[in-house]
């Protein structure tokens, strides 16, 4: 507790008010006005009629000695700003700007309830402030009070119909409830009122790619946003990412490189992490692997990368491979299950290189499978943030960082998954034994217009399903009810759908994959598991879609996987999807001929 506010200390010092007054005066001389005001209030709490304390407090209030708060705000020292403002509340409580400033500080501190209260007080003092009503809407929206937030934004527009930001926020609400047509309408109204509203432009760009699958329109919006705000890292990342997703990686890299040269010194840490992460993906896709790993290191605070707040981990983070020698290392999972299975192909090489003891945090669905696959590793579901028995921690994908894994290194990564040989399945046993077992998936479990560009439809694979020499086995996880409607009844009956949960039962999936002669699909968990299990696998992806090809996907229509040499890739585009199907049929024919000695023309 601060010695100035210690009740016992006040009681002792109250015997000599002069001592307290001297302290307060010294505080004033040093510019410590909030602390001086605090002392005067403490004196007056015991001696309300003390003339010197009252007079000194009045002089401070009259002089309005509030320091320049901008440096503190820029440094995000919001607690200090709050303290200074609250020390002046008696003097300034009738000033709406005071409440607006205090509300903005609480908003930055994510205390949206107090922010709302402050802004409501400010609105009472200045009812015509449309920007203030807009901020109240933002406070309500942060608290998921969508209905009242909507009303607040509408009220702001009644007061000022040309206030573009309210249209932008109303569009955000419509987007939140997935009414994308109305959302786009509001964002278009926003840029009609104010063409430089970069937030509305950004939303329009995201909507164009995410919900419409229109890269060209998205690119146009992001380019305009970057023209208006060239120093905003989000505008840089958005535009560079659109070029990256269209396979125009050179343009993507040019944007990243030019933006970094102009703006790097001004970027805050969180934005720097997002920039580096997205930049690293373009570098990997271009084949600049070592530089990509350097940039990739900074990804840990990027949204949806790590399942926990890594700043709370008290264990030292492993920064270079030399420190890992003979140490006890905790591997913390990141991103999704497919990413886990993919990255762990480097674990055996890491252990051999460092002679380290590994504690492997795993997703519950993978616990038994990974424990069997890595018998020398301690597999855990959770860990203590300050475990003193752990020397270092690292995220899964830092295996590549530490090993500087690149196309020139051979036999570093490879299949490692071991299925349970004691596990049996009546469903698998009933598969016709005289046919080729082809397991396949066609899309991700999460679908929107943007992601569909990277995937296919079930009906695209009708020729493989209807082939009489093939057991076409569904490996697509999730609800496929709507997908099945794409097929005629005859093919729906022929598609073999396992009797277990493909999303959660990885042990049964491992058994089924082991029975397959070939597995194919997009870069999702079933195909990744097949590759990591050593099964002959074909993964199809967009030209820009395989950053882990380390440049191969931009150069070749087909190539061998750099991580698992039992896996091959086919590059495709939506405009030429028929070519993808033809090439996949050739793979199936080749496998059939190898197995039977006879050609099978699909």
Model region roles, listed by residue range:
Residues 1-518, 523-602:
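Alpha-helical solenoid repeat scaffolds of the TPR/TPR-like class and their adjacent stem/linker regions
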């Amino acid at each position: 507790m601060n010695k100035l506010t210690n009740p016992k200390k006040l009681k002792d010092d109250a015997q000599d008010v002069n001592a307290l007054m001297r302290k307060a005066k010294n505080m004033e001389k040093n510019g410590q006005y909030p602390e001086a005001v605090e002392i005067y209030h403490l004196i007056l709490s015991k001696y309300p009629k003390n003339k010197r304390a009252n007079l000194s407090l009045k002089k401070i209030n009259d002089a309005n000695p509030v320091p320049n708060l901008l440096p503190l705000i820029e440094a995000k020292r919001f607690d200090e700003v709050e303290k200074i403002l609250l020390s002046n509340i008696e003097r300034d409580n009738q000033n709406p700007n005071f409440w607006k400033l205090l509300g903005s500080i609480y908003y930055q501190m994510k205390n949206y309830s107090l922010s709302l209260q402050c802004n409501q007080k400010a609105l009472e003092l200045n009812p015509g402030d449309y920007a203030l009503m807009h901020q109240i809407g933002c406070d309500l929206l942060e608290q998921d009070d969508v209905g009242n937030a909507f009303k607040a934004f509408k009220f702001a527009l009644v007061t000022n119909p040309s206030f573009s930001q309210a249209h932008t926020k109303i569009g955000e609400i419509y987007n939140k409830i997935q009414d994308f047509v109305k959302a786009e309408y509001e964002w278009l109204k926003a840029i009609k009122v104010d063409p430089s509203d970069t937030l509305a432009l950004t939303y329009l760009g995201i909507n164009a790619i995410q919900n419409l699958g229109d890269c060209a329109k998205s690119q146009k919006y992001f380019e305009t946003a970057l023209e208006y705000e060239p120093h905003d890292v989000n505008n840089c990342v958005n535009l560079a990412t659109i070029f990256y997703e269209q396979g125009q990686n050179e343009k993507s890299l040019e944007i990243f490189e030019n933006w970094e040269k102009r703006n790097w010194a001004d970027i805050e840490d969180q934005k720097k992490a997002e920039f580096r992460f997205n930049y690293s993906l373009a570098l990997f896709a271009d084949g600049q692997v070592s530089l990509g790993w350097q940039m990739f290191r900074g990804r840990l605070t990027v949204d949806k990368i790590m399942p926990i707040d890594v700043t709370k981990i008290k264990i030292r983070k492993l920064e270079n491979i030399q420190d890992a020698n003979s140490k006890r290392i905790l591997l913390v999972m990141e991103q999704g299950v497919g990413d886990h299975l993919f990255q762990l192909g480097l674990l055996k090489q890491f252990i051999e290189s460092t002679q380290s003891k590994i504690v492997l945090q795993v997703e519950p669905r993978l616990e038994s499978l990974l424990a069997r696959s890595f018998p020398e590793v301690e597999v855990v579901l959770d860990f203590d943030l300050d475990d003193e028995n752990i020397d270092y921690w690292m995220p899964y994908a830092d295996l590549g960082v530490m090993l500087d894994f690149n196309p020139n290194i051979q036999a570093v990564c490879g299949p490692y998954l071991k299925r349970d040989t004691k596990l049996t399945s009546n469903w698998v046993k009933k598969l016709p034994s005289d046919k080729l077992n082809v397991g396949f998936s066609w899309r991700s479990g999460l679908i929107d217009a943007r992601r569909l560009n990277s995937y296919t439809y079930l009906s695209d694979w009708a020729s493989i399903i209807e082939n009489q020499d093939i057991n076409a086995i569904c490996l697509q996880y999730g609800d496929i009810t709507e997908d099945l409607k794409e097929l005629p009844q005859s093919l729906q009956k022929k598609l073999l759908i396992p009797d277990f949960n493909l999303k959660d039962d990885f042990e049964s999936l491992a058994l089924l994959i082991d029975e397959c002669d070939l597995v194919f699909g997009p870069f999702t968990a079933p195909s990744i598991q097949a590759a990591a299990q050593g099964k002959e696998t074909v993964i199809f992806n967009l030209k820009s879609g395989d950053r882990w090809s380390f440049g191969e996907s931009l150069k070749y229509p087909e190539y061998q996987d750099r991580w698992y040499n039992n896996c091959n890739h086919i590059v495709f585009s939506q405009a030429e999807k028929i070519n993808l199907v033809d090439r996949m049929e050739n793979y199936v024919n080749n496998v059939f001929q190898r197995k039977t000695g006879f050609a099978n023309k699909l």
